[in-house]
Amino acid sequence: MPAQIDKASSFQALHAAPGSFVIPNPWDGGSARILEALGYRALATSSGASAGTLGRRDGKISRDEALAHCELIVASTDLPVSADLENGFGSTTADVAETYRLAAE
């Protein structure tokens, strides 16, 4: 599995390249592997998909649940993954910074 810094560099290169790219939203580890096998070059989590896997509506999951979902997707693929972290799961800058710190681990 590529290191986080390698995935970040790959993701940055996709954005710097001419043209555009499609970034699909897997909802679980299996769909992440399928999308990778289909040739997509990056993936993105979806707060709606994450909530749906728990039987809830978008916006109705906790920070810990969102981070666990992101961790599952990241662990299932070698591709870079962009995370949908809603509003950062906090009402203060410190709370949002903590969410992003935890996500980067």
What are these regions (language model features)?
Residues 1-25, 29-38:
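N-terminal amphipathic alpha-helix/helix-capping segment at the start of soluble metabolic enzymes
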Residues 6-10, 17, 56-83:
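Alpha-helix-loop-beta-strand connector modules within alpha/beta enzyme cores
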Residues 22-28, 43-45, 81-85:
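Hydrophobic faces of well-ordered beta-strands that scaffold small-molecule active sites
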Residues 28, 35, 73, 84, ...:
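Conserved, mostly hydrophobic/aromatic
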Residues 31-37, 89-101:
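Catalytic cores of alpha/beta
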Residues 42-67, 87-92:
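Glycine-rich, proline-tolerant flexible connector loops at the mouths of alpha/beta enzymes
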Residues 68-72, 98-105:
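Alpha-helical scaffolding segments of alpha/beta enzyme cores, especially the outer helices
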